[in-house]
Amino acid sequence: MFKRLSLYTLLLCLVPFFIWGISYQWHGNSQLTQADYWLYLLTETGSVPYALITCVLFTLLFAFLFKNPKQWILGVIVMGISVIATQAAKTGAKALFEEPRPFTVYLAEQTHSTPENFYKNDRTLRAEIAKNFYSMDAITPAWLVHHYENETGYSFPSGHTIFAATWLMLAVGFTQLLGNRSFKAKLLVVGIAVWGLLMLISRVRLGMHYPIDLLVATLLAWLINSIIFAFLKKKAIFVMK
């Protein structure tokens, strides 16, 4: 199980490594295409409140992996613990490191200010500043202005990435733990892996994160879920029979 969790973690880590490899850096929205709107819709599946719908959907999609309703209910509790623990780790790291997002750095550069001055304001004022600046930018579409307005927190690590990576770890972990090797189980893992990869790409493409934010968030999800599944392996109700 540990090897399989690590394998899918490595898969997600290919995104930041590839971005570094091609020396891609976001600096404004001049390269936006129609495809980026679809990435925005996908990234919203990890944004509040839509992330709650995503969680409910995944808990239902995971149901067939479990042998009985009791096992599924316990599995849902584990899923909740995993999501809460990883989001708590992300929130703590953001508060500790206070790294600005790419789009806020760009805003500061263009207004001859500094990211530090931007983040001295409360969230309401930061949202207003971001909205006013990017609304005047002809190349930034309204949907992205709205996204910036709602995402004026810190950058490191990526909350959307840790959310997607956590659900991939849960899919891989439970299929391994419960010994479900069915085509449906494989399809579930592959589907979530593709969703996760696109989520990571969207965060850099839309000016929300740097590659290091994605890498550390993915590794945090791997670490926390590796601990969770190492614990679950010792519990009889989840042991393969």
Curated annotation (Swiss-Prot):
Residues 202-213 are annotated as: Phosphatase sequence motif III. The chain crosses the membrane at residues 1-21, 53-62, 68-91, 159-173, 185-204, 211-235. The record marks D213 as: Stabilizes the active site histidine for nucleophilic attack. The keyword Kinase does not apply. GO terms for biological process: phosphatidylglycerol biosynthetic process; phospholipid catabolic process. One of its GO terms (molecular function) is undecaprenyl-diphosphatase activity. This is Phosphatidylglycerophosphatase B. Gene3D superfamilies: Phosphatidic acid phosphatase type 2/haloperoxidase. Pathway: Phospholipid metabolism; phosphatidylglycerol biosynthesis; phosphatidylglycerol from CDP-diacylglycerol: step 2/2. It is found in: Cell inner membrane; Cell outer membrane. The gene is pgpB. Its EC number is 3.1.3.27, 3.6.1.75, 3.1.3.4, 3.6.1.27. It comes from Haemophilus influenzae (strain ATCC 51907 / DSM 11121 / KW20 / Rd). It comes from the Bacteria. Residues 63-67, 174-184, 236-241 are cytoplasmic.
